[in-house]
């Protein structure tokens, strides 16, 4: 390994890093998804080089792939997006229905996922990006990269329709992933999010084709329009997210990966929702989500303390016997 700086393409990588740092200062912090290409990214030292954007920008520009790569249930949806937004995608996960370069669906997925920036370099991707000025705003260039701000990609927003709840919930394996990826690839389903749990008055839907060779999918949703709600004062601090709403009782989606460690103050939930975001139902005008320890972590710490204590006691007794 010779390091990034010794690579012939280091000036290109360094310029990209400096450009993204400036973009964050001018247009705000947020997650970025870049076009994948093994040769282009590999020339920087590793295809994973852009994953260091959070490091080089002091956490301002989040790396979509670096944040979620092999670490959460968001992974398959990232790679479905990467395939739509890259001329030569990696497609590392098997069992997914990948699309080729498709910026129509790719940009809509960027919006629904709260991705703030899209970075493209190939002639094919940049050419197609020009067709969607209402979704992608070209804000910077760093040869060969074009940097776009994704329009209407709020991190938190009110839902237009009441969520439906999967009757299966989360039962392990691919019980959530398979029907959720089918939902993710079907634009006709996007108005109604499917949750793994929720209030009793939310409609329940079955999961179809579970025992067949056809991929499992959610049954048709019941569409119940919701009143509009305004979400303001959004503050994302990583393990703490806060925001305000102008009315309570209307579900909002938080486009951050769900995990059981999240808890909500001033709202019901959070409930896991397609593809892998969180839904909360505000009960107060100020809502706070925090990521903290659960009984699993506390149990692990207790076992660790007991284990270390047992080793120390055993070592002390052994020392006394030797001394005697």
How would you label these PLM feature ranges?
Residues 1, 144-148, 241, 276-279:
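Short beta-strand micro-motifs in enzyme catalytic cores
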Residues 121-126, 257-260:
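Short, polar loop motifs at secondary-structure junctions
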């Amino acid at each position: 390994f010779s390091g990034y700086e010794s690579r012939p393409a280091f000036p290109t990588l360094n310029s990209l890093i400096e450009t993204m740092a400036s973009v964050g200062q001018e247009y705000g912090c947020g997650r970025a998804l870049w076009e994948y290409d093994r040769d282009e990214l590999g020339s920087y030292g590793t295809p994973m080089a852009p994953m260091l954007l959070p490091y080089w920008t002091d956490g301002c520009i989040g790396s979509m792939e670096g944040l979620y790569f092999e670490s959460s249930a968001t992974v398959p949806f990232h790679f479905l997006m990467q395939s739509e937004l890259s001329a030569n995608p990696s497609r590392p996960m098997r069992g997914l229905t990948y699309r080729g370069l498709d910026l129509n669906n790719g940009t809509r997925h960027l919006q629904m996922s709260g991705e703030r920036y899209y970075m493209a370099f190939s002639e094919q991707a940049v050419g197609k990006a020009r067709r969607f000025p209402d979704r992608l705003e070209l804000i910077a260039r760093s040869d060969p990269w074009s940097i776009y701000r994704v329009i209407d990609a709020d991190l938190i927003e009110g839902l237009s329709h009441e969520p439906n709840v999967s009757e299966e919930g989360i039962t392990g394996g691919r019980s959530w992933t398979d029907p959720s990826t089918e939902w993710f690839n079907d634009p006709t389903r996007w108005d109604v999010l499917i949750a793994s749990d929720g209030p009793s008055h939310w409609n329940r839907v079955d999961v179809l084709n579970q025992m067949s060779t056809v991929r499992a999918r959610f049954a048709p949703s019941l569409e119940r329009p919701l009143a509009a709600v305004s979400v303001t004062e959004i503050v994302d601090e990583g393990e703490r997210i806060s925001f305000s709403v102008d009315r309570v009782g209307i579900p909002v989606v938080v486009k951050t990966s769900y995990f059981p460690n999240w808890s909500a103050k001033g709202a019901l939930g959070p409930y896991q929702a397609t593809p892998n975001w969180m839904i909360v139902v505000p009960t107060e005008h100020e809502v706070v989500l925090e990521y903290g320890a659960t009984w699993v972590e506390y149990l692990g710490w207790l076992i660790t303390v007991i284990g270390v204590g047992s080793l120390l006691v055993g070592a002390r007794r052994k020392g006394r016997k030797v001394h005697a």
